[in-house]
């Protein structure tokens, strides 16, 4: 066989969600931007070193031609670079305050902060690049993330999370899981989830969106 991943029950997933919520609520536990950028850069360098291995794994687990798998590996590496550079573009805006006498002489501005725990559910057709698209931005902005890859192609996802940990990301900030259908739905609809990102069929995506807890934002692709 090509490999296997351990099944995850709700107890394990729920414990991670609890810790993710705690991290998000405790500002003193947040990683600094330069720390997150350094982790992503180290992970990108590891991916460059293992590019051929990652490409073979993509090809083997999904049946993709190797020439296309190499393109996917390169796109995933580039996606990491984009996340690092985008960190420098995250900024707030000034709010005009002199439009009323009450605001005259005052300053106000917005800042961007991590939204909170992210749950990602991904698809089979790009088992590494799609995971990078969903997970790396969350790590970049300081959101703990739990990701469920497609059941047919989980190996690249689990390896990417391992690479992030190898690069210095604490394990409590990112986790790959292969849950049952019941545990998957509990994970997605948990009220502690701040953002849900889904890549897959429209029917499944809209169905899951209808079950999200109040306040959970989502992106469907």
Model-inferred region functions:
Residues 2-91:
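Glycine-rich loop-to-alpha-helix module at the N-terminal edge of alpha/beta enzyme cores
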């Amino acid at each position: 066989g090509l490999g296997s991943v351990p099944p995850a029950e709700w107890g394990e997933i729920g414990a991670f969600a609890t810790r993710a919520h705690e991290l998000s609520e405790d500002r003193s536990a947040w990683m600094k931007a330069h720390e997150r950028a350094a982790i992503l850069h180290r992970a990108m360098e590891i991916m460059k070193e293992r590019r051929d291995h990652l490409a073979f794994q993509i090809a083997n687990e999904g049946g993709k031609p190797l020439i296309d798998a190499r393109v996917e590996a390169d796109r995933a590496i580039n996606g990491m670079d984009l996340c690092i550079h985008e960190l420098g573009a995250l900024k707030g805006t000034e709010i005009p305050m002199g439009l009323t006498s009450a605001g005259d002489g005052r300053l106000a501005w917005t800042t961007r902060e991590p939204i909170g725990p992210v749950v990602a559910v991904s698809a089979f057709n790009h088992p590494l690049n799609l995971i990078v698209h969903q997970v790396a931005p969350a790590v970049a902005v300081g959101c703990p993330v739990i990701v469920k890859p497609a059941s047919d192609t989980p190996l690249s996802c689990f390896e990417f999370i391992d690479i992030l940990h190898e690069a210095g990301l604490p394990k409590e900030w990112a986790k790959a899981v292969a849950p049952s259908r019941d545990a998957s739905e509990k994970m997605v609809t948990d009220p502690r989830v701040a953002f849900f990102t889904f890549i897959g069929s429209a029917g499944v995506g809209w169905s899951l969106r209808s079950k999200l807890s109040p306040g959970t934002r989502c992106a469907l692709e």
